């Protein structure tokens, strides 16, 4: 197994959630770190852990971002990090299934991500690069993110399911 560190300049952790039951709000976290331990051919047996700085949330709307940082949602002052610690990764056809423990607001729940291994290459400066994409879905209420507003149409302002996406490039540690 080889250790890799995330190249933050070429990586992104994003999310999307239904808004008013008719559209989606997308955002990302601009400050995060991840470590990967993997063999060089594929992700079999890999360990992938990541840590996100909650205060770095960015939906391109300052008022919304501040609300998301508040105690109504992530309570970034009390719970400054979101973490994921891998338990297992298994090959499923051409992709992988990554399972582990996701902690948001001090609440830890199992989470599963579908992972696509992009492969390995060498950049123009001679540095090895591996890349992969991952997608998962969690129910925000499972992590104490319960704020919402009822709509006159009978729906709610914020959907329960949050789709999480990772686009990661890593270099040897």
Residue ranges and their predicted role:
Residues 1-173:
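Low-complexity, acidic/polar, glycine-enriched regions of mature
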């Amino acid at each position: 197994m080889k250790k890799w560190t995330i190249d933050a300049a070429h990586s992104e952790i994003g999310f999307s959630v239904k808004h008013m039951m008719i559209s989606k709000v997308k955002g990302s976290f601009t400050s995060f770190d991840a470590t990967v331990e993997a063999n060089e051919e594929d992700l079999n047996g890999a360990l992938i852990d990541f840590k996100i700085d909650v205060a770095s949330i960015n939906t391109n709307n300052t008022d919304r971002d501040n609300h998301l940082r508040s105690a109504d949602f992530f309570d970034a002052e009390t719970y400054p990090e979101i973490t994921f610690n891998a338990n297992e990764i298994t090959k499923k056809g051409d992709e992988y299934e990554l399972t582990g423990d996701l902690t948001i607001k001090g609440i830890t729940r199992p989470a599963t991500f579908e992972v696509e291994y992009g492969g390995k290459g060498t950049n123009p400066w001679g540095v090895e690069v591996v890349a992969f994409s991952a997608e998962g879905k969690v129910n925000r209420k499972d992590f104490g993110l319960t704020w919402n507003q009822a709509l006159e149409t009978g729906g709610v302002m914020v959907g329960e399911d949050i789709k999480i996406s990772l686009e990661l490039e890593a270099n040897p540690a």
